Amino acid sequence: MERDFLGAIGKDEEQRRHAEERKESDYFGAGGGAAAAAMDWSFASRAALMSFRSSSSAAAAAAREETRELAFPHFSALDGAKMQQASHVLARQKSFGAESHGIPQYAAAAAVHGAHRGQPPHVLNGARVIPASSPFNPNNPMFRVQSSPNLPNAVGAGGGAFKQPPFAMGNAVAGSTVGVYGTRDMPKAKAAQLTIFYAGSVNVFNNVSPEKAQELMFLASRGSLPSAPTTVARMPEAHVFPPAKVTVPEVSPTKPMMLQKPQLVSSPVPAISKPISVVSQATSLPRSASSSNVDSNVTKSSGPLVVPPTSLPPPAQPETLATTTAAAIMPRAVPQARKASLARFLEKRKERVTTVAPYPLAKSPLESSDTMGSANDNKSSCTDIALSSNRDESLSLGQPRTISFCEESPSTKLQI
């Protein structure tokens, strides 16, 4: 009788309390109120993964719990505190971050298993906190939280036990594995190859450090600076120019000789041109006797021109070179046709001069150089040329020419 009386009195209050709990569970995302029952979490006695029960078993368990509560109602003064505790657990689950990833949050039902049978059975949708003595191993790599490599897993920096942050069973972090990054060891730069091109050959050296390469380049740059002037200085030594430079100062002692004989050493070009004019005159003369005399005179005149400079000991070599070059140039200087025309021109000019000017002072410098001598000899030669027209004329012409090559008379005439 007392049980029926107590059940009738508390029936209305029990129904009102259940309605409020369902509204609160719907607000925190437990499901669709009375239509969708809460999912039951089953915990094994050993460390294993969680498994979900089917919806039919969950509905049957919920029906059994309702019938038990109706049959044996139980009232306690700690019901309000338990409701606040459940709301705090749900708020903690939300703050952990599972709601932000879009994962539905389910409250763990009060399963009647083993050590959990001591909890009050009338709390239907209340959340349950995992106790400190959890069957899950915190050192399991599946539940290990990524941390610094210097921080140990079991012991913190202060020496106490390492405290892991609280997490819900439906959290995505629980089933994730964290990879370990390998050490980033930068490979050392290998020594480069050194390639040297020298004298048309290629030399390659391996494992040459930059310092050694810089030293080699520095030595090469230092060696290239003095080598350039030395090569320039050695090049002229291979040529014949230095002997020519040595002979230039040796010609200077011949200056006193040039003062004594200015006609012979004054310039090499006129000395070469004079024998050419004499040879042309000799070839142009019609008489055989005059040609023979002129040739003999030319050969005789060439002797004094060459012998005095060769007699001097210092300038012996340059004078011999000059004579050889003059002998090589003489036949090549004037062609044969020009020689004949020049001889005819000189012959006619000589005839005009002799007919117009009977005195030797009016002669041209070329003819005066050919007919050099004393004043008496020149007068006699001019009279002989004007009066004679036979072989005596040619012989008289030869006499002043033989005398004209004396060493004393030409100097006086040219200076005046």
From Swiss-Prot:
A motif (Jas) lies at residues 335-359. It comes from the Eukaryota. Induction: By methyl jasmonate (MeJA). Induced by drought and salt stresses. Disulfide bonds: none annotated. A motif (Nuclear localization signal) lies at residues 337-344. Residues 1-25, 283-319, 357-416 are annotated as: Disordered. GO terms for cellular component: nucleus. Residues 187-222 form the Tify domain. It comes from Oryza sativa subsp. japonica. This is Protein TIFY 6b. Ubiquitinated. Targeted for degradation by the SCF(COI1) E3 ubiquitin ligase-proteasome pathway during jasmonate signaling. The gene is TIFY6B. Its main location: nucleus. Repressor of jasmonate responses. Residues 283-302, 366-389 have a biased composition (Polar residues). Keywords: Jasmonic acid signaling pathway, Nucleus, Transcription, Transcription regulation, Ubl conjugation. Belongs to the TIFY/JAZ family. The keyword Transferase does not apply.
